[in-house]
Regions:
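Short, basic/glycine-rich phosphate-binding loops at helix/coil junctions
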Residues: 185-187, 224-225
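Short-chain dehydrogenase/reductase
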Residues: 101, 149-157, 193-201, 205, ...
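Catalytic core of nucleotidyl cyclases, primarily class III adenylyl/guanylyl cyclases
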Residues: 189-191
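N-terminal Rossmann-like NAD(P)+-binding domain of SDR-like oxidoreductases, especially those catalyzing
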Residues: 1-186
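C-terminal substrate-binding subdomain of Rossmann-fold SDR/epimerase-dehydratase oxidoreductases
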Residues: 203-340
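Pocket-edge positions in alpha/beta enzyme catalytic cores
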Residues: 61, 73, 100, 143, ...
Length: 340
């Protein structure tokens, strides 16, 4: 029975979106998903329903389309929106910047205009720690200077500005901006998880594919950083903790009756080799690696100060690195080719 209202989740079939839909359904919300599967898979939608015990409403469509979005709001009584729909590869954004600006900013602009027409103004936005660029001081809090070196990061930074301007122009808007650090792991059922759809861009899915035998070895970029073992340090966050952060944000918009911008991370960094060792322990497989030259633009350490999310929303990451690796391995082992 729906107790808390109906939430529209754009990009709800994706990695973070699917886990968030599970938590929303389990938490008493009804869910409407809009997704065009440009970087997700239809099987994820069915699996969301299997895990949650009840299915979301699903509409296949492009969140950039005003006609699609207007139809969604006309047919369904939407109480709030979580906006995930976006392209997300930094490398691809450097090759196809116009595609990223058109998709990531166009979908948000369409959403803002559609929400406004239908008198719905509670929005949780999926941002990224990419807006902080190359910080040399850690931990990173929300007051750190904002800058970024790639079109993907620019779209997130520009989207945050679009939302800030929208709020300034109309005090009825309530917007929660969530800056994620490094989502990893998978649902404990092994039914949903990250499906890179090719060569992984991020560390843990790459490590997982080495462990399962799909890739020969891991390249570790830099072994001479000023870190405990010389390899880079990042803040890895279990995707279920991240999903629950979105529910905390929805509740926060109602309770606080004002918007906010918060980091979502554990507040603790792990080196690349710590991740490798933890994944070997979780999987029982060796993960061969080779230390190579640093990549241009990398920093040695990047991790969040997530205290503001706890103070404002009561949210704190619960799962440790061992749990992240165990859940990610279960997904990879049970689904060696992802959803295919």
């Amino acid at each position: 029975m729906n107790n808390l209202g109906t939430i529209l989740v754009t990009g709800g079939a994706g990695y973070i979106g699917s886990h968030t839909c599970v938590e929303l359904l389990a938490g008493g919300y009804d869910v409407v998903i809009v997704d065009n599967f440009c970087n997700s898979h239809p099987d994820a939608v069915a699996r969301i329903g299997r895990i949650a015990g009840r299915a979301p409403i699903f509409i296949e469509g492009d969140a950039c389309s005003a006609a699609v979005m207007d139809d969604v709001f006309t047919r369904h009584r939407i109480d709030g929106v979580i906006h995930f729909a976006a392209l997300k590869s930094i490398g691809e954004s450097l090759e196809k910047p116009s595609l990223y600006y058109r998709n990531n900013l166009g979908s948000l602009l369409t959403l803002i205009e559609t929400m406004d027409r239908h008198d719905v103004r509670h929005l949780v936005f999926s941002s990224s720690a990419a807006v902080y660029g190359y910080q040399t001081s850690v931990p990173i809090d929300e007051t750190a200077p904002l800058s970024t070196g790639n079109p993907y990061g620019h779209t997130k930074l520009m989207a945050e500005q679009m939302l800030a301007d929208t709020v300034k122009s109309d005090a009825r808007w309530r917007v929660g901006v969530l800056r994620y650090f490094n989502p990893v792991g998978a649902h404990e059922s092994g039914l949903i998880g990250e499906d890179p759809g090719g060569l992984p861009n991020n560390l843990m899915p790459y490590v997982a594919q080495v462990a399962v035998g799909k890739l020969p070895q891991l390249k570790v970029y830099g072994g001479d950083w000023e870190t405990p073992d010389g390899t880079g340090v990042r803040d890895y966050l279990h995707v279920v903790d991240l999903a629950r952060g979105h529910l905390a944000a929805l509740a926060g918009l109602r309770k606080l009756d004002e918007g906010f911008t918060v980091n979502l991370g554990t507040g603790r960094g792990h080196t690349v080799l710590e991740v490798v060792r933890a994944f070997e322990a979780a999987s029982g497989r060796k993960v061969p690696f080779e230390i190579v030259e640093r990549r241009s633009g990398d920093v040695g350490s990047s991790y969040a100060n997530a205290s503001r999310a706890h103070a404002l929303l009561g949210w704190r990451a619960e799962y440790d690195l061992a749990r992240m690796c165990a859940d990610h391995w279960r997904w990879q082992h049970q689904n060696p080719d992802g959803y295919r």
